[in-house]
A protein has these predicted regions:
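Beta-alpha-beta core module
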Residues: 46-52, 56-57, 71, 78, ...
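Alpha-to-beta junction loops
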Residues: 13, 29-38, 58, 107, ...
Length: 192
């Protein structure tokens, strides 16, 4: 969607797409290697500015044939005693949201496994028959052996933001920021 917004205004703009962990994206923004990035808010980078795109709810991710998959929604207490997978420190913002949610819920779970990225998480869930908490966008990438269910009750969220260096004077960045409301509206209308 962001590319379409830019192409509408600047059909000859050259955009490079890459995928990386939020801390690395924040570092690239800080060093001026990229003008903008979609990432999780990194508190350790005060020279960056963030524009909120969406608050993503966390969902329970589990094997499709898991006993909890028969439920429409899952109480966080239902995961006690299950093999629990969390994210590693490659995603510190997400890890903090998960850990704080469990703590607020009065649940003390030590992860049995930690995943560095989404594909690893899906593989671990399928192979260990464990459960995990991930942002709702992960539902777009689930293999048939893995499903998701919403959390019952208070649902934690994690911000997806557009990050950029405050001192960046790029005209393309300014254009993207000027069309941010349109971008958010387009993304909000898309079904998950």
């Amino acid at each position: 969607e962001a590319l379409q917004v830019l192409r509408d205004e600047l059909p000859n703009v050259d955009v490079v797409i890459s995928s990386n962990y939020s801390p690395r994206l924040a570092d690239a923004l800080t060093k001026g290697k990229v003008d903008a990035a979609f990432l999780r808010r990194e508190e350790s980078a005060p020279e960056l500015a963030y524009e909120l795109l969406v608050k993503e709810p966390l969902v329970v991710v589990l094997p499709s044939d898991h006993r909890l998959a028969t439920l429409e929604s899952i109480r966080v207490q239902d995961i006690i005693g299950e093999t629990f997978l969390s994210v590693s420190d490659t995603a510190p913002a997400l890890r903090a949201v998960i850990d704080n949610y469990l703590k607020r819920s009065g649940i003390n779970i030590t992860p049995d496994h930690e995943a560095d990225h989404l594909a690893m998480g899906m593989s671990l869930i399928a192979s260990t028959r464990g459960v995990g908490l991930l942002p709702a966008y992960a539902q777009n990438f689930l293999p048939s052996s893995v499903t998701s269910r919403p959390l019952k009750g208070e649902t934690p969220t994690i911000d997806l933001v557009l990050g950029y260096k405050k001192s960046n004077e790029s005209l393309i960045l300014k254009l993207l920021l000027s069309r941010l409301d349109e971008l958010v509206a387009r993304v909000s209308k898309k079904p998950r």
